[in-house]
Amino acid sequence: MKYIMTAAALALGAGSAVQAADDVTLQLKWVTQAQFAGYYVAQDKGFYEEEDLNVTILPGGPDIAPTQVIAGGGADVTVEWMPAALAAREKGLPLVNIAQPFKSSGMMLTCWKDTGISEPADLANRTLGVWFFGNEFPFMSWMSQLGISTEGKSENGVEVLKQGFNVDPLLQRQADCISTMTYNEYWQVIDAGVSEDELITFKYEDQGVATLEDGLYVLEDNLEDPEFVDKMQRFVRASMKGWKYAEENPDEAAEIVLDNDASGAQTETHQQRMMREIAKLTSGSDGALDPADYQRTVDTLLTGGSSPVITKEPEGAWTHVITDAALK
C-alpha cells in the first residue's frame, strides 16, 4: 500500500507540485478494538486520503485520559463518552461534541439468574459491581429513580462494589451483578464458560438512563478557525463513511482492526463478535448528534444522586456546524 501511494505521489509530482494533505490526530478512548473500527476502516480504505487528510490514530488505554491528551495539544479530536466530556467542560476544559457516531448505549448490568433477580426491583439488598471514573453516574441515576439507596445492603439499598475493567467479581461470586458492555465484557463472561441461560441483563438503554457514549470532541476555541472547521468536516465525512462500511462488512472491518492492533492482544473471534455488536449501536446514526439524546444524557447526569457528574445545564457543549456541512 505504501509503495502504491509513493508511486502515485511521484507521478503527480512529475507534472505539478503536490499539496501536502492536512494532518489530523485522533485520540481513541480505549485500546485498538472494533469499538473504533470506523476510523481504522476509513484509513485503510483511503476515505481520509480522498478528503486530503493524513490521519494519525492514537490508541488509548488504562493510563491514557483522552481529555488530558486533547487539553495538552496531543490530539485535534478525541473519542469520548459524553459524561466525561461534560464533566471536563464544567471543570474548565471547553470540549464540544462535533459528531455522534454511536446512537445507542452498550452499557448494561449483567446478573446471575440463580440469585432470583428477574426485574430491576429485585436488585435491592444485592452487591452490584459498578465502574467508576464517571461511568457510575447512569447507574446512580437509575438507582435513584428506583428509590434504591447505594449506601449499603438493605431492603431498599444495594452494596456498590467498585469494579475494575474485568468480570472477575461476577465469576467469583463477589457480586450478584456487574457492569458490562454489550460488545465486550458480557462476552468475556460467556467465554469463561458461563451459559447465556444462566444470566439476566438490564440494558441502560431500556431503563431510560442511557448516556451517550462514543462521540467526537474538539476544543471550542478551534471551532473559530475556518481551516480547522473545514478539516473536521472532511474528517467526519470520511469517518462516517468508514463506519457505514464497517456496519455492512463486519468481518472485513474486524480484520482491519486486527491489522492495526500493535499489541497483538485481540483475537479474530472476539473482534468479529464485537464488530457485530458495535454495528447495532452505530446503525441508527448518520453522525449528527440528536438533541433529544443529548438532553436525556444531561437529565440523567443531573439526577445522579448526591454527587452528580455535572451540577448545572451545560451551554455550548455541542454543535451541528460540522455535521451540517459534512453530511449534506
Where are these regions (language model features)?
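Secondary-structure end/capping motifs
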Residues: 224-305
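Conserved C-terminal helix/tail region of periplasmic/extracytoplasmic solute-binding proteins
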Residues: 294-328
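Sec-exported extracytoplasmic/periplasmic mature domains
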Residues: 44, 71, 90, 144-148, ...
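Periplasmic-binding protein-like
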Residues: 101-111, 195-224, 276-278, 316, ...
